[in-house]
Amino acid sequence: VLIRVLLVVTLLIGLSTVGIGWAGADPNALWTIVHDECSPHEEADDDPAPCAVVDTDGGYAVLKDLVGERQFLLIPTLQISGIESPMLLDPGTKDYFADAWRARSLVEERSGRSLPPDWVSLAVNSMVARSQNQLHIHIDCLRADVHQSLTQDADSIGSTWAPFAVPLAGAPYSAVKISDLNDVNVFQLLAEGLPGAREDMSRRTLVVVGSPSGSGFVALAGQADAAAGDEGSGEDLQDHTLCAAPAAGK
């Protein structure tokens, strides 16, 4: 038992020392934690530790990130490298965004209040911007300036991909409305909807936010651009420090 605890602590310390972007972390740390610790613990003891949740039927785990007070990561229990994986474009593979959206309740618990949907965000970074070779969706509050931009230009977002009116966190994004995350694979929506995306998914980043209109969602897609110094980090649209969101209904 002591060896098992020390392994988990070592892995988590490895993640905690890298901060945003996790540069320099063991690229297999997340997979090791979920595959070797969380899933076996859930199966043997009905205890997902060190994860907060392991949903065996759903095929995912949720782990508290050591960066930020409220940030959680949804991680498939199936080994999937990241946004570039062809598996995510297979009709038989789920995209995990609906599961991540339901897991926002953990963010709300840490925030001490229910959060308006348009203040909650889900982000998948590009291959360039990540250091973990296991797909993970960042779940946290949206940055206040990004929320303001999305609210101000909500009417410009339609049912097909189009460039968003202004840069978000200094980077260009395309946006599209989604009515229900249970009815769409957001990775496939990106690959099929933006020219060239299918061929270079590794450079793409995806963010999903509750719609400012109060119904449905907004998906945002960016891409790494070395010339512009853009790594394709959708996580940059999130606020891991201070959640400015009011309580839901206020």
Model-derived features with residue positions:
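Bacterial N-terminal signal peptides
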Residues: 6-17
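Positively charged n-region of N-terminal signal peptides that target proteins for export
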Residues: 1-5
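HIT superfamily nucleotide-processing domains
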Residues: 21-250
